[in-house]
A protein has these predicted regions:
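Catalytic Walker B motif of ABC-type/P-loop ATPase nucleotide-binding domains
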Residues: 162-166
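Helix-to-loop junction immediately C-terminal to a conserved catalytic motif
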Residues: 68
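Conserved structural motif at the start of ABC-family nucleotide-binding domains
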Residues: 22-24, 37
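The feature captures the beta-strand-to-loop junction immediately N-terminal to the Walker
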Residues: 53-55
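Conserved ABC ATPase "signature" region
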Residues: 110, 118-134
């Protein structure tokens, strides 16, 4: 019997890909009797990249805020990888990330760096090609620069679960490419992703599967393979067809 050392190493580093990092069960939320989230259930396995796609106001950000503990809910439950006393296992980019405008981008990262070394900061700055402006004050940054800094913060301490709300907003095509590659690389190392967008085509190249959300409800989960079968169609029309069938 031949032992595959590479397989054993990958298992020890990443696990077998079946470990549940996040499990959401029948989650519901209301505000003043208005349904925000309705009976949502799904799970994320280790190393997987899952998209969350829907129109503006469909419930994407609300769901992410509940999972991150920024918002309450009335029914259901969820379990996620536990926070370690000395390590943050969850990284997040949510709308309007809290950046310190009168500090440099580098100093913003230093505040949140768990390592005694600046190596992790320099690595993420290189990966996102932020070197030219990382030492400038954040108040001078464009929208795209701030977005990349928010993404850098989410990735900084190599969390096991990374939740990204509309990460491609404000990014030029080169930056989108860099972020996609970073996501794919981190997933290979074992990080798990939940990534939202209102544009299906933004995510299809990197996600293992995509959850379609409409009016606070998950109406369908589609795999990358299923979407690739529709590659001759406009993916946004595919998304609209899925939503229309539910109405």
């Amino acid at each position: 019997y031949e032992i595959n050392i590479d397989s054993i190493f990958n298992y020890l580093i990443k696990g077998d890909g079946n470990m549940s990092i996040l499990s959401v069960n029948h989650l519901s939320k209301k505000i003043n009797n208005k349904i925000i989230l309705k009976n949502i259930s799904f799970s994320l396995n280790e190393g997987h990249i899952v998209g969350l796609v829907g129109a503006n106001g469909a419930g994407k950000t609300s769901l992410m805020k509940v999972i991150l503990g920024y918002s309450d809910y009335q029914e259901g439950n969820f379990t996620s990888i536990r926070q370690d006393e000395n390590h943050c296992n969850i990284g997040a980019l949510i709308e309007n990330p809290g950046l310190y405008p009168f500090m440099s981008g580098y100093d913003n990262l230093k505040l949140l760096n768990e390592s005694n070394s600046t190596g992790p900061i320099n690595k993420i700055v290189d990966d996102l090609k932020m070197n030219k402006y990382i030492h400038n004050k954040v108040k001078t940054y464009s929208l795209g620069m701030k977005q990349k800094l928010g993404i850098a913060i989410a990735f900084l301490n190599s969390p096991k679960l990374i939740i990204l709300d509309e990460p491609m907003n404000g990014l030029d095509p080169k930056a989108v490419r860099d972020v996609r590659q970073l996501i794919l690389n981190k997933a290979k190392e074992g990080s798990t992703f939940l990534i939202s967008s209102h544009i299906l085509s933004e995510l299809v190249k990197i996600t293992d599967s995509t959850l379609i959300i409409d009016k606070g409800k998950i109406i369908q989960e589609v795999t990358r393979e299923e979407l690739e079968q529709d590659e001759e169609q406009d993916l946004e029309n595919v998304l609209l067809d899925i939503i229309d069938k539910e109405e």
